[in-house]
Structure formats: structure tokens, C-alpha cells
Amino acid sequence: MAQEYDYIIVGAGSAGNTLATRLTEDEGVTVLLLEAGGPDYRFDFRTQMPAALAFPLQGRRYNWAYETDPEPHMNGRRMECGRGKGLGGSSLINGMCYIRGNAMDYDGWAKLPGLEDWTYLDCLPYFRKAETRDIGPNDYHGGEGPVSVTTPKAGNNPLFHAMVEAGVQAGYPRTEDLNGYQQEGFGPMDRTVTPKGRRASTARGYLDTAKKRSTLTIVTHALTDKILFEGKRAVGVSYLQGSTEERVEARARKEVIVSSGAIASPQLLQRSGVGPRALLESLDIPVVHDLPGVGENLQDHLELYLQYACTQPVSLYPSLLWWNQPAIGAEWLFNGTGIGASNQFEAGGFIRTREEFEWPNIQYHFLPVAINYNGSNGVKEHGFQAHMGSMRSPSRGRVQLKSKDPRQHPSILFNYMATEQDWQEFRDGIRLTREIMQQPALDPFRGREISPGIEVQTDEQLDKFVREHAETAFHPSCSCKMGTDDMAVVDGQGRVHGMQGLRVVDASIMPIITTGNLNAPTIMMAEKIADKIRGRQPLPRSTAAYYVAGEAPVRGKPMRDVTPAAQ
């Protein structure tokens, strides 16, 4: 006899945990939350210590470790596509950068038919609802939400301050809050870390409250194989429990909600018979509903590291040496303080590279050490780096099922750098970053350019560097987009077109990727749609002011002009 619940949520990640928590706030509403990974072990420093963020990306316990097909514009490289596995999903292994995106992202969504209630001022109350910011609430920030947000503090690494000042000296705006009135410019970067220095995943923030409720059933190591249908209505799921091949069925009285992320959500829909007819028929999967957009429109952020030697011994290089790590770990474990308590992304910025961009098209994360995001290729000396990436690439990829076997990864192609705009943005971005790095604020610290290296100057040389060294920022999205056009998969409430009792709620339903990291927007979307599912009135629209660049120039006069013309 299959167990029966009101709602079945597939995926205990940033969206799924938010939904499970909010839906079970209503008395008597029962929810089954299925997670293919394991628990979020609180004693495992790899997922709980912010500074250890590279560790989960190196293994398979917490990471699906997908790979792309050979990327045609990236020398045919198979590129990493890490996704979180375990309670918390990608909030269990991400870089913990709390960035909401630009107000214009959401106003842009709201111009699309059917998405009129996704303006920034409609979304802002849900960002606030989800958040508790350590320095207190205001018009932009919450004080009572499940997500702990920590702001950078005085006395942190001097390189953070110097990099922000260098951005301002290069002629760009200063902003005190990248999630407040004005995203554009350089400033401190908030992080999803608790006041005790622990990673604030959605498992910690949401599930710690909800899992005490008898109406919420959480099953880990449960890999969902298929959504079950009667006609066009979703009525349940079948999943594999543990490492066995035994299938367990569960029934949903109201809805099945797919929150498996931008790779696994389209994969599950396709495996269940909802997707492009030709693809399903080629795999001998009975077509429940021909929906051509499932798995299409895939987007991501691509980024580069520009690395510099540091002439003063202030970088985090010593913390990479094994003999220094026990003391760092002990301070974090017992006091929740020190290097271990920060993700070390405490400064960043957003700029427009050209006047034709209405809002920023480049994001910076600054890091006071020279190392790859996944912890590899650390430079054996004091150094620092800027992560520089383009925000709204016109390139589009896709996710396609390769097999009926739920354990086989799908075919993933982001089609990175497929347009001339991509190449222009990266060339501009590298050159502008070099101008920023040459400003007086970094004079006390700046040594030689380690990467790309000062000899890399022409368009052709820069393009070669991008092809060989650009990496994902781990922001896959948009593969089950909201909208009303022929390629839309869901409506503005996440309901799958042409189906009943079936929703998708996660980063895959974004129509266009947002300007920045995706964890905060994903949680916001789940908060907003949770109210729709519960039949509640939406939170009142915000009246907060927000910055629109309009005719404002991209930048002012730099303090030190280092362009070739000036030389």
C-alpha cells in the first residue's frame, strides 16, 4: 500500500526545504520530502565550516559532480558542473555568497507575459521574509527569517578594503550594500553564515524548525525515478531507496513539486514522459505530455580568476599549509570565529562594461588568496585574486536525458561563449580588471600578475586564455523556464503547462538568469510560490526605492589612468 501525502517534494535543496517548511506551517498538511543524498552531518567540517567550501566540490558524497559534454567554444573541454547532494542541496556546498540579483532582473522578468507579479518590489518582501541579517532589518533586509546572513566586519583582511577602494578609484560607484538600494559598484559582500560561524544552509535554517513536525516526512538516500500520472494529472512518485533496486511508491493527494535543480528537474520530467516528443521517443519513453522547452534555455555564469602576487604577508596563503590548519579549525570549532568562520568572499562588485548595458553585466568576487574555486592549483606564495564573470550571456544550452536509468547523468551542454557578445564582455572585463588592480589602493600589496600574465594582451591572446581557463560559477538555471511562450515549461506559479497537480520550483524556472549568485533568488522564489500554493494573499508590495542607472555614465574619471592611450 503506497503511503499518501498532500504534497510530495522531490529534492531537499534551497527551494525544496523552503517549500516543505512553509507548507507544513498549515495545520494538518502532510508533506513527503525526498532527497537523493544523505543528511547534512553537523560534525562534518567540510560542509559546516565556511572556509572549507572547496572540500565538498572535490568529492562525491555531497556533490553530483556532473560534467558537460565537450564545450565547442571552449577547446572541447568537458567542464565541471557541481550540484549539491544531501539535505540543503547546493546550499550545503555553495560559496555562501548572499547576492540577490539586480532589481532590473526582476523588472525584466515582469515584462514577460504571465509574469507581471515578479517585479522587484513584488519579490523584495519575500527576500526579507527569508532573511535574518546580523546587523538588523531595514527596508531591504529581514530580521526574522530562517536564513542567517552575516555582514563583513571591521578588522577583516586588509585586502578586502583595498580591492573595494581600488574599484572606486577606477571610477566606479561605491555601494554600502550590494543587496540594498544600489547593486552597481564595489562594496562589502554578505554571506549565508550563522552568528556562530556555521554555514547557513536551508537544512539548518528551514528544516531544523520543520523536521520536528509530525506532518513532515523526510527520506534521504531516496532517488526519485519517475513521477506517476493518471492521464495528465501527477498522482505520485516512484523512488529507489538506498543502493537497492527496490522501488517505493508514494501518492500525492494534491501536488507533486519538483525541486531538483536546473540539471535534475528537467531530467526527471523527461524520464517521466514530460518533455520534447522526439527526445522521449528516441529513448522509448511513453509521452505523457509533449513539452518542447523541458531542458532547453539552460544558462550559467562563466568566470575567470585574475591572480596577483601579494608583496605583504597578509593573504590567506599560510592557512593553506597543513601545519597551520589545526589551530584555525580549533578556533572555528570552539569559538565560531577566525579564518574558518568566513567564506573569504567579503568584498565584491558589479559594473557595466559599456553604455549599452542598462544594469551591471560583470560581477566581481575578491579573494585574499590565489587558488582555484575547488581548492586546486593554489599558488605557492602570498597572493590575491579577482573572480570576474559575465552576468547575462546570450548563449543558451540544454539538458537531455541519455537513459531511462535514474543513476545515469544526463547530457549537459551550456554552449558557453557561443556569441560575439560573450567574447567582447570577457575582453572588456579582463582589461577593466587590470585597470582596477593598478589603482593606488593596491600599491602596498600588488606584486606581479600571475594569471593571465602581463604578456597576454591582444584580443586573440585574451580569447585563448578564456577558452583554456574560464570555469563555471556553478549557477545552472533556466532549463524549465516560467512564461507563456511555446518554450515555457511552467506558468508564473511554477505549474507545469498542460498538466495538473505538477509544479517545478527551483532555479530552473528562472526565465533569464539573475545578476549574481543564485541561492538567495532561489529561496525567494520558493517563498513566493509557497504563498500561492497555500492560497495566501501575496505579501504587500515593497515601496523601497532602488537605483536605475538611466543616463548615468558607466564610470567616472579614474584616479590613475593606466590605459595604453594615457601611457
Swiss-Prot record:
Example GO BP: glycine betaine biosynthetic process from choline
Positions bound to FAD: 6-35
Record's keyword annotation contains Cell membrane: no
InterPro entries: BetA, FAD/NAD-bd_sf, GMC_OxRdtase, GMC_OxRdtase_N, GMC_OxRtase_C
Top EC class for this record: oxidoreductase
EC number assigned by the record: 1.1.99.1, 1.2.1.8
Known catalytic reactions: choline + A = betaine aldehyde + AH2; betaine aldehyde + NAD(+) + H2O = glycine betaine + NADH + 2 H(+)
Cofactor(s) required for function per UniProt: FAD
Coiled-coil regions listed: none
Keyword annotations from UniProtKB, A to Z: FAD, Flavoprotein, NAD, Oxidoreductase
Positions annotated as active site in the UniProt record: H475
Molecular function GO labels: betaine-aldehyde dehydrogenase (NAD+) activity; choline dehydrogenase activity; flavin adenine dinucleotide binding
UniProt function note: Involved in the biosynthesis of the osmoprotectant glycine betaine. Catalyzes the oxidation of choline to betaine aldehyde and betaine aldehyde to glycine betaine at the same rate.
This protein's name: Oxygen-dependent choline dehydrogenase
Organism field: Pseudomonas fluorescens (strain ATCC BAA-477 / NRRL B-23932 / Pf-5)
